[in-house]
């Protein structure tokens, strides 16, 4: 792994660990703080809202100051959030700690993804992007089991040492990064910045909306798939944890193979196909239930497609505004966090009036809408794209980082 990639990978692992730490400990936190599980769960909402708001300001900062400072600030803020959460004596302070964590997560995710565009030459970003996207699954595969073990053996408060330790590693990697500043990116004078630049560009705007819709559908599935397994197949929570880990492994595998796929197939078509494939499998998973092994195989296949879609789409997003990777990836962070909230809300509303079968078709419709939106996004890497010639003479200078 090339040295500049290490801080980017650690930043996304740290961000995801800061997000998912609540999943295994939410019941214990409620018992200790004398609060309901639903009340404690609002910490995830607070984190998401904070990350969305913070992303409005983080994108321009990355484009002005570079990736490295935001990686460091994000690691420090996420570490502080973990400490504040661990020592919180009551629910209000516990929720308040999520504001600090959410700001750190926004920095880590936005800068982590923007670093691929800022630190790697054009044409060499697909493989690093696969590592950065796939790194998020490490927290589910390794981090959550460790958090659960620490919670059972000692306390949920000590469990926050897991994301805290990863944040320390991310901070050290950022400080030791060989890249001092993203000097290779030259922005034209007077160019708009931040999310304003994103939403005034038609193609970048379509890409952002496509990500929002896709994350809403994907998150609705992730939020309720555990309940689906339990209610449909009467399996234990422990078994559900294993089943979800299988999906995370599939996601990681596919992110690392996306670079080779984008060399063989047109990137935009690959994203559209993966989105439609995800939607079709979601509909089948929640309507055809002969055996848990059958569902697990479909879930594995869907997670493979999710990894391909996420990795290829992130690269496409960076190419929308090559001179402003911070702004584009801040819009990705905002779309993802809003998607988490919308997905949980929409899924809950559907299940309140229908069942999992209907939810599957709703998610199919969502992924189809995302695919339609992506189909209208310009791909500078594609021959014949209206941005193709502009991409060749973009403000991104050829560069190599050892």
Predicted regions and their residues:
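Conserved MFS/SLC helix-loop-helix module at the cytosolic interface between two early adjacent transmembrane helices
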Residues: 53-89
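Helix-to-loop junctions at the C-terminal end of transmembrane segments
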Residues: 54-66, 254-266, 351
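Cytoplasmic helix-loop-helix junction between adjacent transmembrane helices
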Residues: 99-136
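Helix-loop-helix hairpin linking two adjacent transmembrane segments in secondary transporters
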Residues: 123, 130-178
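Juxtamembrane intracellular "pre-TM" segments in multi-pass secondary transporters
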Residues: 179-208, 398
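C-terminal transmembrane helical hairpin of 12-TM major facilitator-type secondary transporters
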Residues: 268-313
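A late C-terminal transmembrane helix in Major Facilitator Superfamily
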Residues: 323-354
């Amino acid at each position: 792994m090339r040295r500049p990639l290490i801080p980017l990978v650690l930043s996304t692992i740290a961000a995801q660990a800061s997000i998912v730490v609540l999943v295994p400990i939410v019941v214990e936190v409620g018992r200790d703080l004398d609060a309901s599980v639903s009340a404690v769960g609002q910490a995830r909402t607070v984190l998401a809202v904070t990350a969305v708001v913070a992303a409005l300001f983080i994108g321009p900062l990355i484009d002005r100051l570079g990736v490295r400072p935001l990686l460091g600030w994000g690691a420090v803020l996420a570490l502080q959030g973990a400490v504040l959460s661990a020592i919180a004596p009551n629910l209000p302070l516990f929720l308040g700690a999520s504001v600090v964590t959410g700001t750190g997560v926004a920095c880590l995710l936005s800068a982590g993804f923007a670093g691929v565009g800022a630190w790697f030459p054009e044409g060499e970003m697909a493989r690093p992007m696969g590592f950065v996207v796939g790194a998020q699954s490490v927290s589910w595969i390794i981090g959550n089991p460790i958090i659960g073990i620490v919670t059972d053996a000692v306390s949920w408060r000590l469990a926050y040492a897991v994301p805290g330790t990863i944040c320390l590693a991310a901070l050290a990697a950022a400080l030791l990064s060989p890249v001092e500043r993203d000097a290779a990116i030259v922005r034209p004078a007077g160019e708009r910045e931040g999310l304003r630049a994103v939403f005034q560009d038609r193609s970048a705007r379509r890409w952002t909306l496509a990500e929002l819709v896709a994350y809403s559908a994907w998150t609705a599935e992730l939020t309720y798939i555990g309940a689906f397994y339990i209610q449909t197949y009467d399996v234990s929570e422990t078994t559900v944890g294993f089943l979800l880990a299988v999906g995370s492994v599939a996601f990681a595998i596919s992110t690392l193979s996306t670079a080779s796929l984008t060399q063989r197939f047109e990137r935009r078509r690959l994203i559209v196909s993966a989105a439609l494939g995800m939607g079709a499998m979601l509909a089948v998973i929640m309507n055809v239930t002969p055996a848990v092994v059958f569902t697990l195989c479909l879930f594995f296949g869907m997670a493979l497609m999710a990894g391909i879609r996420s990795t290829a789409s992130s690269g496409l997003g960076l190419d929308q505004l090559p001179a402003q990777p911070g702004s584009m990836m801040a819009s990705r962070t905002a779309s993802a966090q809003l998607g988490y909230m919308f997905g949980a809300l929409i899924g809950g509303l559907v299940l309140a009036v229908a069942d999992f079968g209907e939810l599957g078709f709703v998610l199919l419709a969502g992924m189809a809408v995302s695919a339609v939106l992506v189909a209208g996004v310009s791909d500078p890497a594609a021959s014949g794209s209206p941005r193709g010639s502009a991409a060749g003479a973009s403000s991104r200078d050829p560069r190599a980082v050892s």
